[in-house]
């Protein structure tokens, strides 16, 4: 495996001078697409492993916690979203990773034990379009020092506090302007339909995509994947806008205290990196096919954000035919001077903001696509998880994970198929059937980078604090990483 050092100065030109970290690629683990987790079951709709929708790292137990999304089938299968605990070996000198070990699986559930479901709300028993019920599309995760989780849901969008066992504890209050509503009298809430019917709030399948906590756990920050339906000009319903929102929550009350603007990279700049013009992103792709996948606090008022397009290795793209990738990037942002836009509709321009509004500042931290191209690696579609790992001898580890969509696609009749690729053209087989010879399911990919250099100082020392042994031992036991669960762990070596 090739390892090399990337200066963020040389990654690509950002809107402003990029950050000055020294970033070294540490390698990749491909977790097989047919791997299973530790939940009961015997088919892909029950326990196929997928953990790359977001992840967080616990320094005390050296454990990563990654979450699934709503499951295979895109909201048409009763899959129980969950959190997966796993460990990897990380070389203290290079940051190279190896030996993926799944140690526990916890399904998100109500206090009575009823699991949350990836089904659209109106597909739940007795469900309607107007209430979420037990519907959950988990896309972001943060973790408190006591082992509890904050989960960002895309359906609402919602933020839920879960116990370390995955039990629902309480919901935060979603700002009213983010809730999807119809334009009819009364502005009925509608969590299911698209922009043909819903005219304000989050776009369909574009709710909260990431969540993070500040250093003392008093504030949470949830980020939208794309602009709101009303945040833009004309009839495109946000799809031509670059302006999406970050919401600051007070953890104690669960109330939103601020909304800030994050500006996506303009598609013109992205198109300039794509050969020719045949594969350029059109106007309606700006705020729909280009978006944000993750947010991670790194210290003070600074965060890392993954921004990406919808191209690259993934089940649907493999079947349709891969197109040139334009954007897989990590930006360092600072919210210190960002204006509160809680009461502001951003409908005067798709790009420019009113003079009274200052967005979060933004510097390029890492061009993921360029780094992987230099390393001779494939570029997956969905980079959705970022975690600050352990300290190394010189710097620290940063890990990324991809969402492989369970290696599943579906047709217009909502019939699911496994996508197999490898030798020859990609093929589809019945869900759960073996792949043809020479082909495999799309894996979840886990990447490591070593971060060092002057700007590593932007990362708070609290990110690397290790609790007293007695404290974290209790948390590990509470999550089920000892005893029977440890004896059942799965080891995947790459």
Predicted features and spans:
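Selective for proline/serine-rich intrinsically disordered segments
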Residues: 16, 465-467
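Short, charged juxtamembrane terminal tails flanking transmembrane helices
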Residues: 489-494
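Gram-negative bacterial Sec-dependent N-terminal signal peptides
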Residues: 1-20
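A short, hydrophobic C-terminal helix/tail in secreted or cell-surface proteins
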Residues: 468-486
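Hydrophobic alpha-helical segments
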Residues: 7, 18, 63, 475-480
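Sequence/structural signature of beta-propeller domains
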Residues: 21-464
